[in-house]
Design a protein with these regions (language model features):
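Catalytic core of the metallo-beta-lactamase
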Residues: 43-126, 157-158, 164
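Active-site HxH/HxHxD metal-binding segment of metal-dependent hydrolases
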Residues: 1-66
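Short beta->alpha connector loops
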Residues: 8-11, 78-81, 153
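Residue-level detector of flexible, active-site-proximal loop/helix-junction positions
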Residues: 34, 81, 177
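Short active-site segment of divalent metal-dependent hydrolases/proteases
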Residues: 11, 102, 177
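A general structural motif
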Residues: 1, 24, 91, 166-168
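Cap/insert and terminal regions of metallo-dependent hydrolase folds
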Residues: 16-17, 21, 105-107, 111-198
Length: 198
């Protein structure tokens, strides 16, 4: 294992555990995360050094290593509220992302659990999940009105760049892997951002 990547400013809790298991691995993360971890009071969150930190003003020129850069395309979505690092594993055409968008419900995660033992979401969880599906306009609205609100021009530019990549599969942190019509689903979810308007 050569790299430990925090997919955004929220997905970092187990970096210390991974660094202990793989002490020579380089830690990669978004702007603000090293400082957030330094200020943390949780004993499980260490003070490890980051080898590469993606920043808005240098995101196109940031290099991890020649080997990494040859196989992986990176887009730092600084316009996203969580400061997303989106990866394209070029050899297999796989897009990997944390919170750029969700694909709920997460049926794969519970595929080995009996119906009787599956969690039963309450009203709030059902409402949240309904806005985190790739079908319909709920997630589109959330992305447009809330998630990208802080810097929509930069968010749009990032989404447009990701859309130009050649991928067939999307691996989200939240929800099922998208193995069919990945480009079409991406274009539908981000339609307004790709056009730059609603």
């Amino acid at each position: 294992m050569q790299y430990i990547i925090a997919g955004d400013i929220e997905h970092h809790i187990f970096i210390s555990d991974w660094k202990t298991a793989f002490p020579t691995a380089k830690i990669i993360g978004p702007d603000g995360l090293p400082e957030k971890r330094q200020a943390a009071t949780d004993d499980k969150i260490g003070k490890e050094e980051f080898a590469v930190v993606y920043k808005a003003d240098t995101k196109r020129s940031t290099s991890v290593s020649p080997e990494f850069d040859a196989d992986i395309e990176v887009e730092y979505v600084d316009g996203h509220a969580n400061k997303e690092i989106v990866l394209l594993y070029k050899p297999d055409k796989v897009l990997i992302q944390a919170d750029l968008f969700f694909n709920l419900p997460a049926t794969e995660a519970y595929s080995r659990v009996s119906e009787a033992d599956k969690p039963k979401p309450g009203l709030l969880a059902r409402t949240f999940m309904s806005a985190q599906k790739v079908e319909g306009n709920g997630q589109k609205r959330l992305l447009w009105h809330a998630i990208s609100r802080g810097n929509r021009p930069s968010f749009n530019e990032s989404v447009q760049r990701i859309d130009s990549w050649d991928f067939n599969i999307i691996v989200p942190c939240h929800g099922d892997v998208i193995e069919s019509n990945a480009k079409g689903i991406f274009a539908r979810v981000f339609e307004w951002h790709l056009k730059g308007r609603k």
